[in-house]
């Protein structure tokens, strides 16, 4: 409570106190012993209009700055108990970052002045549309600071309330995990799937009005708040979900039009003149040549979902032949997961099977992990492998920003030596025609295409053991398995120490093991054990002899690598939280199996854009159709023309024709110069 006169002064309202009643043409408020006279300006009247509902005549002018009068006013508009909450708002509403933003826009920075300014905006009928993002900010990493301030503000509010209640033991405390908890509970938080580098970048470029202090209620998003506004041009792309989340989650453009590190947005008059692929399109739209100008907008939204979110790396894939350069920019725009970028100028000092070591000119060293890693696909319920490789050798120099290692299934330089380019799909010869082999959204593919578009899929099987359980048999990472094969066999602990001793002695006796009532962990697929991970809440010293040996063998292998690259060894005993919740004195073992998944009947492929096909038949090898022009070249798939027309994806036939022209032009030039090539397009 700052008092009425102070509030009027901060609102820059000229006022005076008079004992006699002012003329009717003046604005005034009557008190018990006088009148408060103020300028009858529209903004002043709107701000002070609420006082006419309050019985000011019961109070003298001397009482207008007192807390009792303020509490009585609160009682009229709600309840007196809200006073403590309003005090907290007064102290905490304007955080340092908000104050900086207000100064940038030349807005008031003090709580009372901000409320007065907000009231003055009601004077005119001018308004901004719900979807007009002018004046909004693009916030990224600063959200962590918001969570910190939120946690501190909540703690301070509780402390202030205890102080006002005269609690002598009042303390300002904060939960150790408060910031992490707020981040995890935020409506914009989600797991990062590692299917492709394209998905990684689009996940980073996803924006929403949801989140901390945002519009988090689904009923807030009516049609008028889901449409695309002209103020979004060169800031937000047209791509969005095409289901219930349409217009709620959006994608930023590649080169978003922002000002300053705080991400200020302005509605520029020349925005249309500045429109181009980088400024106007999302990365997925830029990787879909002709798509935004020739496809139905609804299909463009579907392209974003099918290409960015559902696309997966395959056995063989190629870059675009028709490109605007976005596919070459992509490896430099993502993190080091799929393409490792040098932080400074430097040189390669060591290359081993598991890692590469580099030394920068500043004297700093860096290590590139060349091992195969299992990463999560949070949307699909399976995992994938990511492995970086390098084309460099020991002693080779590089510049800051150069890509020194990359995932070869994601990138290649096939269409330009040294120009690393994103592999978006398999370049294949198809026929667009009316045929029973491809009716509506069904299609037929060749056996070679089915193999080229195969993927290595990883599935997980886990087992939770007590620390005294006895391991009878186990397989190791790298071992081949068949579906249903036992990978890990153990028996529950017994209380009798003599019985435990007997069990430990029988470990090497397979016949005896089979007769025991053991528990087995079997493989779900036929493939290879890719990795084994262990999470334990107990030290190995407390485990059974066989379980301790199993865990230590895996620990030692990991520690050998960490010592070689001079990285700290992680704590082996973990708290019983997260995935280990309610797992005291237990060991969680995760087995990851990789299997080779080729295309089969019922699988879906995307020809391009949002044009998908469900496989109804696979041509056997040697039975594929061929064209009369290139008799050595087999057709990889048949695409029904009705599917192209019905889905209004005009970019597909145009891009197909352009690809054909480029391929045949390349061959014609090679024919002129006598350069041999494979006319089967299989190399």
PLM features: residue spans?
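Conserved mixed alpha/beta core segments that line enzyme active sites in large multi-domain catalysts
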Residues: 1, 184-255, 320-344, 349, ...
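Solvent-exposed alpha-helices and their adjacent loops that cap or buttress functional pockets
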Residues: 114-116, 228-230, 314, 423-425
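Conserved structured catalytic cores and adjacent interaction surfaces
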Residues: 262, 268-683
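A short, sequence-level motif marking secondary-structure junctions
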Residues: 42-44, 251-254, 369-376
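Short alpha-helical segments and helix-capping/turn motifs at coil-helix boundaries
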Residues: 132-135, 233, 415-417, 514
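N-terminal non-catalytic structural scaffold regions of very large proteins
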Residues: 1-206, 242, 253-256, 260, ...
